[in-house]
A protein has these predicted regions:
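Small-molecule kinase domains that catalyze NTP-dependent phosphoryl transfer to phosphate-bearing small molecules
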Residues: 66, 130-187, 191
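Conserved lysine of the Walker
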Residues: 15
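ATP-dependent small-molecule kinase phosphotransfer cores
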Residues: 35-104
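ATP-dependent NMP and nucleoside kinases share a basic, alpha-helical "lid"
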Residues: 90-142
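P-loop (Walker A) phosphate-binding loop of NTP-binding proteins
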Residues: 10
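Hydrophobic positions on the alpha1 helix immediately C-terminal to the Walker A/P-loop
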Residues: 18
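Post-Walker A helix-loop "phosphate-sensing" segment adjacent to the P-loop in P-loop NTPases
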Residues: 24-31
Length: 191
């Protein structure tokens, strides 16, 4: 079975694009840490809330408007305040099922050093790849839209340990993907 992969980095660096290529070309399945948060949102808000969509909520302090991404961040952090590893515990249940079925997994939403540490405990063979791009390139890719930038999940990844780095600033998607495959297959490819 192929080695599990965790992709870590800022918004717009190319993590999801690389994950989608692993799914398409190598039979991986995306299994995100935030999938559990999405399921909670779907239970409360029938169709869920898209990352860029806005939603008006009533709080004790009054009404507030949040994007779907901000709502996910707040729910994620509120539960992490109770149990730092709660969402990883939820993730590990699904991971175990995939592993037992022989399905390789890519996680493209690793955000915190504690998540990397716990992933390594749960799956010692996992390769953690830092995906990076210059801020201007990321801004352009996201059409200038960043949401939830003040959240720890948007900056916490910087302190996480990783096994390889792919800087997507000046390389093609194909070059970045080739570097990722080389890292997975045992090369120490850093682009």
């Amino acid at each position: 079975m192929s080695r599990p992969v965790a992709l870590i980095g800022p918004q717009g660096a190319g993590k999801t694009t690389l994950a989608e290529l692993l799914v398409e070309h190598r039979g991986y399945r995306r299994h995100g840490i935030a999938d559990g948060i999405r399921r909670v949102l779907q239970m409360a808000y029938r169709d869920g809330v898209a990352k860029g969509e806005t939603i008006e909520l009533q709080r004790f302090s009054g009404k507030v408007t949040l994007t779907g991404r901000e709502l996910m961040q707040e729910i994620g952090m509120a539960v992490r305040d109770v149990d730092l590893h709660f969402w990883l515990r939820v993730w590990s249940q699904g991971y175990s099922e995939l592993w037992q079925a022989g399905v390789p997994v890519v996680v493209d939403d690793v955000r915190l050093p504690s998540e990397v540490q716990m992933l390594r405990v749960l799956e010692p063979k996992i390769i953690v790849v830092r995906v990076h791009a210059d801020a201007e390139v990321r801004r352009e890719r996201r059409a200038g839209v960043y949401t939830g930038n003040g959240d720890i999940t948007e900056t916490g990844w910087e302190g996480a340990a990783f096994d390889a780095t792919i800087d997507t600033t000046a390389v093609t998607v194909q070059e970045a993907y080739a570097a990722l495959v080389a890292a997975i297959d045992g090369g120490s490819e850093n682009v």
